[in-house]
Amino acid sequence: MRLCRFNDNRIGLVRGTNLHDVTAIRDDLPAVRYPLPAGDPLIEQLQRLRPKMEKLADQAKPIPAASVNFLSPVANPSKIIGTPVNYQKHREEADKDAQIAVYSGANRARTIEEQGLFIKASSCLVGPSQGVSVHFPDRRTDHEAELGLVIGKRARNVSEAAALQYVAGYAIALDMVVRGTEDRSFRKSIDSYGVLGPWMVTADELGDPSNLDFSLTVNGELRQASNTRLMVMNIPKQISWASHWYELLPGDIIMTGTCEGVGRVMPGDIMALEFERIGRMEVPVRAAD
């Protein structure tokens, strides 16, 4: 199943080049009162609601996917977790570019274990149609193409062997960053600097996430191209490690690291990202208001 949010927070299932409006499923979500529970209620209830969503999609008129504005498929993540320098060639390029690297001495980029995971503010999350807004045009804003995974149920201290059982699905992720000397989370949490989309492919449909080709172009120029098999720390280990530091909640997002080829974007650019077995999304770059 391919779950999306589109236009004015409508919910859809994507089938081929069309989507089917299943927004009525919101009536089946549990009623909540203040204080609102953390996490995304639709993602938490997805397995229970899935049969009815499929039935609603069967009855809905198809809408061309190209005609809608895609939001992030996850509306309410409690947190976005990032994995740094998770491709060896990206670490090598960071060693050569002081604006990318966070050094620990001897002029080398620190390893994942040395740096630890990092947190992006959930308020930075947008969908591809909303685009990226460059807030500091005098500084370098870089693209980082990544596989994003969405947690489907509460997870704490899970083993690597069981980790994938906690994944609701996968999406294309874009981890934007302003280069500089400030803390990484500070520079990666700017409004619109976390893009997720164009939809979430459920874990059962995508299958094994450890061998997916992906790429990113800017204005048609190839910038990044790699495969998830080249991750330094694989996905089960990332989930397990994160769950030993934080309780993972339904809707939480892990951006699993980027490959080599990161580079600057400017207002007016168009980024296009493709992931095997997920799809393609275009993300415009604009100047911030």
Enumerate the predicted regions with their spans.
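N-terminal non-catalytic cap/leader segment that marks the start of a structured domain
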Residues: 1-106, 111, 207, 215
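Residue-level recognition of short, solvent-exposed, well-ordered loop/turn junctions
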Residues: 75, 82, 127, 142, ...
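Catalytic-pocket segment enriched in acidic/His residues
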Residues: 47-54, 61-73, 86, 90, ...
